[in-house]
């Protein structure tokens, strides 16, 4: 069952690195990451080094697969060392590159596992979802973090929003593939501009996840069209504004005392720390929450950027720990502004 997909791996190796993007990254990230950029660049440009974690679906638990994973040397994320780590979440990691086959979508049959970059589970764990809570996944497609949220707890209400119509279809299929019908009934899927969610549903949610549209460094680095890649470089400077607007909307949708987690899959300081700094400077009712404990307890599985992350964590790809990029920041809303 754990035969690696050599054809897919070779396909990735055949992809060409986009020199325009790599040069852009080199100029920016060598300054922002310092010496760490050399290793990060090596991993990002070598798909043969990439790793894939296996998140088991508690609604159709694959006991035989779990045995196979143990035999192959896989281990569970954090092995229970994280505070408030849900026992229902089983995510298996391997130190060696490779992946197991993806399962096909079959109507009426729940998938047994979800393949993901292990770092993408950290925003979900940081949210600390509890049974019965109302939660919003503001930018939910393709659905991996929504699936992970439902492995953690059974919310009273889960609102999965995605503005892009093509990605929305992907999101719906993902949910149908992993979640049983009784739980589907507590999930709402919408196609609303995330910047308007706060006005549409003010102070509705206990927890909000904003996995924001971002540069998506891994994918962008292998752009097949250099002209489009160059265009994206100029458009990239507009992303922080969008991210800030999404966060402001999310804050409106969050009840007083509620928790918001912001995440991206880019190394960019402008899209990570600078965005959070702008929110903290412009919202007196928003306070940063310390998540440095995650870095301390997960250091055996992830490498974190050592500096420049005052209000969050940045997972950077490393040898034997090829997870990330993934930025995570956790915020708390202290009181209501009463302005919608």
Swiss-Prot record:
Gene3D superfamilies: 6.20.240.40, Vaccinia Virus protein VP39 (3.40.50.150)
Subcellular location: Mitochondrion matrix
Active site (UniProt): 265 (nucleophile)
Example of a GO biological process term: tRNA wobble base cytosine methylation
UniProt KW keywords: Disease variant, Methyltransferase, Mitochondrion, Primary mitochondrial disease, RNA-binding, S-adenosyl-L-methionine, Transferase, tRNA-binding
Chief localization: mitochondrion
Membership in a protein family: Belongs to the class I-like SAM-binding methyltransferase superfamily. RsmB/NOP family.
PANTHER family: NCL1 YEAST -RELATED NOL1/NOP2/FMU SUN DOMAIN-CONTAINING, TRNA (CYTOSINE(34)-C(5))-METHYLTRANSFERASE, MITOCHONDRIAL
Protein name, per record: tRNA (cytosine(34)-C(5))-methyltransferase, mitochondrial
Species this protein is from: Homo sapiens
């Amino acid at each position: 069952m754990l035969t690696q997909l050599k054809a897919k791996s070779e396909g990735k190796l055949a992809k060409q690195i986009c020199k325009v993007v790599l040069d852009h990254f080199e100029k920016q990230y060598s300054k922002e990451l310092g010496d760490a950029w050399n290793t990060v660049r090596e991993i990002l440009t070598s798909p043969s080094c990439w790793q894939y974690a296996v998140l088991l679906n508690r609604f159709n638990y694959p006991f035989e697969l779990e045995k196979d994973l143990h035999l192959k040397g896989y281990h569970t994320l954090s092995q229970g060392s994280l505070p408030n780590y849900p026992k229902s979440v089983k995510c298996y990691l391997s130190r060696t590159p490779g992946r197991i086959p993806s399962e096909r979508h079959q109507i009426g049959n729940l998938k047994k596992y979800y393949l993901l970059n292990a770092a993408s589970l950290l925003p979900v764990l940081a949210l600390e979802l509890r049974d019965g809570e109302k939660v919003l996944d503001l930018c939910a497609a393709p659905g991996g973090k929504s699936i992970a949220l439902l492995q953690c707890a059974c919310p009273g209400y889960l609102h999965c929003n995605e503005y892009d119509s093509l990605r929305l279809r992907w999101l719906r299929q993902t949910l149908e593939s992993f979640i049983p019908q009784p739980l589907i009934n507590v999930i709402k899927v919408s196609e609303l501009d995330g910047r308007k969610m706060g006005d549409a549903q003010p102070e509705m949610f206990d927890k909000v996840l904003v996995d924001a549209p971002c540069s998506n460094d891994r994918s962008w680095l292998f752009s097949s069209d250099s002209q489009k890649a160059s265009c994206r470089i100029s458009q990239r400077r507009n992303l922080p504004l969008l991210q800030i607007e999404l966060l402001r909307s999310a804050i409106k949708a969050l009840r007083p005392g509620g928790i918001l987690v912001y995440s991206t899959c880019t190394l960019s300081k402008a899209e990570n720390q600078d965005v959070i700094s702008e929110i903290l400077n412009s919202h007196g009712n928003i306070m940063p929450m310390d998540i440095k404990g995650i870095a301390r307890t997960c250091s055996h599985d992830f490498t974190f950027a050592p500096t420049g992350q005052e209000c969050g964590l940045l997972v950077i790809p490393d040898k034997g720990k090829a997870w990330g990029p993934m930025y995570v920041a956790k915020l708390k809303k202290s009181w209501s502004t009463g302005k919608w």
